[in-house]
């Protein structure tokens, strides 16, 4: 009835039995690799694969991934077939009918380090290398990723942990070497809608002869990331060789970091942070610095808006984050400067990928008077980099930056970058909009960045490129009842309605204060 | 180009446009509800649904669920069709071709409470009601569930939080009222492989005339839960009315708690805890007590094995957990007793659903001499309940329990329970096994419960019912080199090989110490 078997003779035999024929089902499961197998498949029985099991899958290319099993109880698949989601199919570089092999994955050893962190133990470089390596290899499910990020937020990460995490994140991807210095870079810690200085700063620095190979993120919890905005102006999904060609040709670029595999786990972590709407200090520092170090940056300016509804709300929080950035950065050999900026209201007029792109174009085309705050912010940041990179004398950076805007050289540099990345294009405009009017006479007294950003997201940003908000007033603006305060833009009626419902449920996001002492 | 629209006129219009035709794809996505839509579907565009969006879905039955969107880029679906996973299909009670309506779900407001907990703020009853309610409604993704459990483990839950969580978990499901007292119950905090006393205790208590409507869990991180074991002896997936009928007829039952919707979020939380391999004190107390209170228990005995490789490792940890159980239990009106038991080695011989069932049958059939430790443990626990329930005088419970085993009344009560639940059946045996022999002469000095449990899981338990481990020696057993120490049992060669590889990579799980002073 039961029989005794010789284990040592098994592997070869198994390797042939565990093969199925690949079929592209065309199901896009986002970042998750999913495989579909018939519930009556002999391999499920033989290997004890249960529904939702994590399975190691390999094809003829010899690449292997960990995928989640979904069982199929109808005739969607023929016997002997295995269905693969788009992500699984593309990662394994399969062709229709290829043989696919399935085995149990090795146990997820780094999970014990995650558990230790949950219970408050710090993680060392080995732990973090193991965790980040397993994330990069796709071995962490959403459950594991969320636990790692939650534990990291729950127990404040030490300086050593953040530095080690940064290094782990750099080491698991490519690291660019430009064979020269300085390589300048900038980053904004975000939280301020519309603060889209990057394309302007890159254009100015490149116009001044500096090398600025900028990789940017998509939005984490905001209505637009720089990559989202830049994508409305030119292609941003360049691979490393294309990025290198652009930078060698024109001196700079503005591309999506995710496509060049610099700090590749960052985007995975960002997806989870977005779902949880958290972004801890340690994770933020590691995310930013790993990207910069991997991109080969030597000199970095960090724009840190501070304000009651910005990401960094108080001067104390700013000082803590600044200290972390400075300490980790200098420890890793990065020349780093932090500029605290005014985070009390959005910068520019637009909030959302395309709407912010229109503001960028205004500044570069000498229509900066329409968005004076964005113009000032961009020239200050660019000026700092011009000085750090010795393209301008100390104290004269901002002046040179302004000059490069006015004389059109920054615009020409930007055009050259867009052309080199695949061609300049005009940002889209939204088919639907709704104007929110001032409910009374008075002065704009407060603007809630967070709820404004939320409304922009409900309107469809950043996924709907043209969606978002346009501000028609800023802090201190004199308003007359019925005058446009801001407008919602969206690509669909459903989204417009959704954003509108949210606004209707909220107190004023832009507060109009009646003047106390009318003249 | 852009047009202004009247928002107030939209909803009715949208409700007709947002309808697709249901198609059962037969894809089993486990607990997750998934919907499949063509990437070119007009609703995706109109509503701004992105890949992996969470969408509120409803059918003609008026039930609504939150499902995850997967886009389909091939002709798997015709235009106008929507595919639904098995979970989504069954929850919505659809028929082929039914109209299905899609809208944006309301924002997940309870997520802000989860974030507060991540950053160390305690949760109150309102927060917990909101979180548990959203979990019960399927609004939490794996990412959210994992963050909630991780945060709860990272910041020790206060007594108040655990009590409130327990109540939230009770209130979100059914609560049974048996119209009489006492209603006795037992629970083991687990961590000790093979400790399958429950079926024996229920049989004894029912034989003594007590009412014991026992609901049990499936395994969390162990090779078998009581429900897994009981399922090899009789059906356990009874709904509440079937459970009630069984208890009214024979005085007790042993059913799977998940099927009767008592504390329904518990199984969802357990799935995540299993993936993370964590089980915090607070979560454990809430999980156990919510099930017992919902089941209508008035008197509860908790078996708490303590040992270096049990779930509770030290007397300090036991005291802490005991204090939590006692305080939360009495606060919620439960008469509760905790018995610390020896957790230094497995109880009985078998580890795994069916292998443990065979041990249970041995005790009930007066072959308890083969599993003396299981017999003693079960009669002590049953004795305590007999005394609490006033079926035995103080100090005489264990004696009566033994008598009911010996005179066959416990066995007859067990047979009656199995019959009432749908019929007794014999547990399966595994087609493959491998014996691990003693590497030397000596005495069994230590047994590592955790690694033994892990090996049993790698062999396929609990999903493969017949899989697991049989111990041929216990602590203190005299061994001769080559004598059987334990054996691996599995339903597939793949699993046997997998468990074997693990054992080969480990130091001895059962340590044989050479005798220092041979006589």
Swiss-Prot record, chains A, B:
Give the enzyme class.
transferase
GO biological process: any one?
A: pyrimidine nucleoside metabolic process
Gene Ontology CC annotations of this record: cytosol
Task: Name any one GO molecular function.
Answer: thymidine phosphorylase activity
Superkingdom field: Bacteria
Query: PROSITE patterns attached here?
Result: THYMID_PHOSPHORYLASE
What EC number(s) does its UniProt record assign?
Answer: 2.4.2.4
Record's keyword terms, sorted: Glycosyltransferase, Transferase
Family classification: Belongs to the thymidine/pyrimidine-nucleoside phosphorylase family. Type 2 subfamily.
PANTHER family in UniProt: THYMIDINE PHOSPHORYLASE
NCBIfam families to which the protein is assigned, alphabetical: ARCH_P_rylase, PRK04350.1
* Protein's UniProt name: Putative thymidine phosphorylase
Organism from which the protein derives: Maricaulis maris (strain MCS10)
């Amino acid at each position: 009835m039961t029989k005794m078997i010789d284990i040592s003779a098994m592997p070869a035999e198994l390797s042939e039995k565990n093969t199925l024929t690949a079929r592209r089902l065309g199901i896009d499961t986002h970042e998750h690799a999913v495989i579909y197998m018939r519930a009556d498949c002999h391999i499920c029985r033989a290997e004890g694969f249960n529904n939702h099991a994590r399975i190691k899958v390999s094809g003829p290319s010899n690449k292997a991934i960990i995928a989640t099993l979904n069982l199929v109880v109808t005739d969607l698949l023929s016997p002997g077939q295995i269905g693969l989601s788009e992500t699984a199919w593309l990662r394994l570089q399969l062709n229709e009918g290829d043989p696919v092999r399935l085995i149990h994955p090795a146990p997820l050893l780094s999970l014990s380090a995650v558990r230790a962190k949950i219970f408050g133990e710090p993680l060392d470089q080995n732990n973090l290398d193991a965790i980040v390596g397993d994330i990069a290899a796709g071995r962490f499910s959403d459950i594991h990723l969320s636990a790692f990020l939650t534990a990291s937020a729950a127990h404040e990460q030490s300086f050593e942990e953040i530095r080690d995490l940064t290094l782990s994140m750099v080491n698991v991807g490519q690291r660019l070497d430009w064979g020269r210095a300085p390589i300048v870079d900038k980053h904004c810690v975000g939280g301020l809608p519309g603060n889209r200085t990057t394309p302007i700063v890159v254009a100015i620095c490149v116009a001044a002869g500096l090398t600025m190979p900028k990789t940017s993120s998509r939005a984490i919890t905001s209505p637009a990331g720089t990559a989202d905005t830049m994508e409305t102006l030119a292609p941003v999904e360049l691979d490393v060789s294309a990025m290198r060609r652009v930078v060698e040709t024109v001196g700079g670029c503005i591309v999506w970091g995710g496509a060049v595999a610099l700090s590749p786990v960052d985007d995975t972590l960002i997806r989870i942070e977005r779902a949880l709407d958290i972004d801890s200090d340690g994770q933020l520092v590691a995310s930013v610095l790993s990207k910069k170090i991997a991109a080969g940056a030597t000199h970095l300016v960090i724009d840190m808006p501070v304000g009651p509804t910005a990401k960094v709300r108080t001067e104390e929080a700013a000082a803590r984050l600044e200290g972390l950035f400075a300490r980790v950065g200098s420890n890793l050999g990065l020349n780093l400067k932090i500029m605290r900026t005014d985070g009390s209201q959005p910068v520019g007029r637009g909030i959302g990928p395309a709407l912010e792109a229109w503001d960028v174009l205004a500044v570069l085309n000498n229509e900066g008077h329409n968005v004076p705050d964005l113009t000032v912010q961009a020239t200050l940041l660019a000026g700092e980099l011009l000085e750090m990179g010795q393209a301008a004398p100390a104290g004269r950076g901002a002046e040179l930056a302004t000059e490069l805007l006015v004389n059109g050289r920054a615009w020409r540099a930007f055009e050259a970058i867009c052309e080199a990345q695949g061609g300049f294009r005009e940002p889209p405009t939204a088919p639907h909009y709704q104007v929110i009017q001032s409910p009374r006479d008075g002065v704009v007294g407060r603007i809630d960045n967070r709820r404004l950003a939320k409304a922009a997201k409900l309107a469809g940003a950043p996924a709907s490129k043209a969606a978002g908000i346009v501000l028609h007033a800023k802090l201190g603006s004199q308003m007359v009842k019925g005058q446009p305060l801001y407008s919602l833009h969206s690509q669909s009626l459903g989204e417009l309605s959704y954003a509108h419902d949210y606004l209707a449920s909220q107190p004023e996001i832009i507060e109009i204060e009646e003047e106390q002492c009318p003249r």
